[in-house]
Design a protein with these regions (language model features):
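Phosphate/dinucleotide-binding and metal-coordinating scaffold of catalytic cores
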Residues: 1-321, 325-447
Length: 447
C-alpha cells in the first residue's frame, strides 16, 4: 500500500544517489522551486572528488549549479529536469501508471512536482540512480506470472481499479509506449516481484513487454525474431525469450543496467544532449559525434555503425534518441549499451525517426550508409561487409519469425517492406556476396 503521509507535503527536494557497480555515493541534490517551476541541481563534493562525471555534455561537474531556466531549449517533456534525471522517469505507459498510483495515494495533481515523481521511484529507477526521501510504498510481494498477466490485461483494458499497488510500481518505472513491467524473476519464471535496487539471490532483473491494444498478439514473437536476428548478425543484445502468460505471449529481455557487480549507470543519447525523443531529425552522424565526446572504446564505433545498418535494413524506424544509450563501466569509462527495442516499425509517416548521412529517413541507400562510415572511424572497405551482413539478416528474419509462430497476416506486409528497403540498399554490395562479419567480438551477457 502506498503511504498517504505525503498528502499535505509536496516534495520539492531530493538527494540523488548512485550505486554504480559498488557502494552508494551521494551524487547531488535537486531542488524544485514550485512558484517559478525552476529546477536546480548541484553535484556533491563526493561526486567531484571521485570525478563522477555522469552527464558531461550538459551538466558537467565543473558547472556549479545547473538551473533549468538557463537552458535555452530544454524539452518540455523533461519537466524542468536535467537529462540524466529525466532518463530515470518513465514516459508513455509508465507515466500513465505512475499518475494513477499517485492518484490512488490521494496526492492532488497540483502537488505533483518532478521531485515527487523521483521520490515515488526511490530505488526502482532505471540505471544506477536512487532518490531520497523515498515515498513509502511497502515491501515487494512475490506474485505468480499468471497474476501478473491478469493484472496487466486489466490495466491494458483500462481497469486500473483491479490492479495491485505492486503492478503499478513495476509498470511505472520503465520507459516506452508499450505496456511493460520491470520485475525480478526466479530462474523458472514462476514468480516475480517489483525490482528494487539489486535482485535477491536466485532472481534476475527482466523487462517483460506485452502486446498493446493496437498491436497484433504475436508482436512479442516478432520482437524475439528481431533480437535473435540481431544477435546472429553480431550485434550485442541481451538474452531474450518469449513467455506464455495467461495464454498470451510476452517478450522478456534481461536488463543490462543490472549485473552481478551491481547497478550500471545508463544515460540515453537524448538525455545526454537534452534532446526530446519526440523530435524528428537527429542524425546518425550525431551518434558518432557523441561517442567521440565521451571517448568510448574504438570497438564501439563498429558496433554502433552496424546498428545503424541493421536499423536501415530491418525497418527499425522507432530509432529515436531514447533508443540509443551509453553506460559507465567499472573503469568509469563510457561505452555504448547493448542494443534494445529492435523490432519492425513503419515509423512516423513511414520514415525513420533519425536521419542518415544525406538526410534520407525513408529508404536509405547503400551510399547513405557508406557516407556514414568515416564518422564511425571506418573505411569503405570495412563498411561494405557490415552492410552486407545486415542486408542478409533482413532476408532471414521473416522465415525465422514464421517458425516462431508469427502469423502470415503479420508477416506479409513486413516481407514486402523489407524487400523494398533492401532493393534500395542493394544486397549485392560491390558486385558480390560479402562474408558474414560480426561487428565486434564481444562476450555474452554476464550471468
Amino acid at each position: 500500500m502506498i503511504s498517504t503521509a505525503w498528502l499535505n507535503a509536496p516534495i520539492h527536494q531530493v538527494d540523488v544517489w548512485t550505486q554504480h557497480l559498488g557502494p552508494a555515493i551521494l551524487a547531488g541534490r535537486l531542488n524544485y522551486e514550485r512558484s517559478s517551476g525552476v529546477a536546480y541541481f548541484e553535484w556533491s563534493d563526493e561526486a567531484r572528488s571521485q570525478h563522477l562525471d555522469l552527464s558531461p555534455l550538459r551538466v558537467p561537474l565543473e558547472m556549479g549549479v545547473w538551473a533549468s531556466n538557463r537552458e535555452r531549449e530544454l524539452p518540455e517533456d523533461y519537466r524542468g529536469l536535467p537529462g540524466f534525471l529525466n532518463d530515470a522517469l518513465p514516459d508513455g505507459w509508465g507515466l500513465y501508471l505512475m499518475d494513477n498510483a499517485l492518484a490512488r495515494a490521494g496526492i492532488p495533481p497540483e502537488q505533483i512536482t518532478p521531485a515527487t515523481r523521483l521520490a515515488f521511484l526511490g530505488d526502482r529507477a532505471w540505471g544506477s540512480l536512487s532518490f531520497q526521501p523515498v515515498m513509502e510504498q511497502g515491501t515487494s510481494e512475490l506474485m505468480s506470472l499468471d497474476v501478473l498477466g491478469r493484472e496487466m490485461e486489466a490495466s491494458i483494458e483500462g481497469h486500473l481499479e483491479a490492479v495491485s499497488d505492486e503492478l503499478l510500481q513495476a509498470g511505472s518505472s520503465p520507459q516506452g509506449a508499450r505496456p511493460k513491467v520491470m520485475v525480478d524473476c526466479d530462474e523458472g519464471f514462476r514468480h516475480a516481484k517489483v525490482t528494487r535496487g539489486l535482485p535477491d539471490e536466485g532472481f534476475r532483473s527482466w523487462i517483460i513487454k506485452f502486446a498493446g491494444r493496437d498491436e497484433p498478439e504475436d508482436a512479442p514473437l516478432l520482437e524475439l525474431a528481431y533480437m535473435t536476428t540481431a544477435r546472429n548478425a553480431g550485434l550485442h543484445v541481451m538474452d531474450s525469450k518469449v513467455l506464455t502468460i495467461q495464454g498470451k505471449h510476452a517478450f522478456a529481455t534481461k536488463r543490462f543496467d543490472r549485473s552481478p557487480s551491481g547497478r550500471v549507470f545508463t544515460h540515453t543519447l537524448g538525455g545526454l544532449m537534452h534532446f526530446s525523443h519526440r523530435r524528428i531529425g537527429l542524425d546518425y552522424g550525431t551518434v558518432a559525434q557523441v561517442m567521440d565526446a565521451l571517448q568510448v572504446p574504438e570497438t564501439a564505433y563498429q558496433e554502433a555503425y552496424a546498428r545503424a545498418a541493421f536499423n536501415a535494413a530491418m525497418s527499425v524506424r522507432d530509432d529515436h534518441s531514447k533508443n540509443f544509450a551509453f553506460i559507465k563501466g567499472q573503469d568509469n569509462r563510457w561505452d555504448i549499451s547493448p542494443a534494445y527495442d529492435l523490432t519492425y516499425m513503419t515509423g512516423p509517416g513511414g520514415y525513420h525517426t533519425m536521419t542518415f548521412a544525406d538526410g534520407d529517413t525513408q529508404d536509405p541507400t547503400q551510399q547513405d550508409l557508406l557516407n556514414l562510415a568515416p564518422l564511425y572511424h571506418l573505411s569503405e572497405a570495412q563498411a561494405r561487409p557490415i552492410i552486407q551482413t545486415m542486408a542478409d539478416a533482413a532476408m532471414q528474419v521473416v522465415p525465422m519469425a514464421r517458425e516462431m509462430g508469427v502469423s502470415n497476416a503479420t508477416l506479409k506486409p513486413i516481407a514486402s517492406r523489407l524487400g523494398v528497403i533492401n532493393a534500395s540498399i542493394d544486397r549485392r554490395i560491390g558486385g558480390g556476396r560479402g562474408r558474414q562479419v560480426h561487428p565486434q567480438d564481444r562476450k555474452g551477457d554476464s550471468d
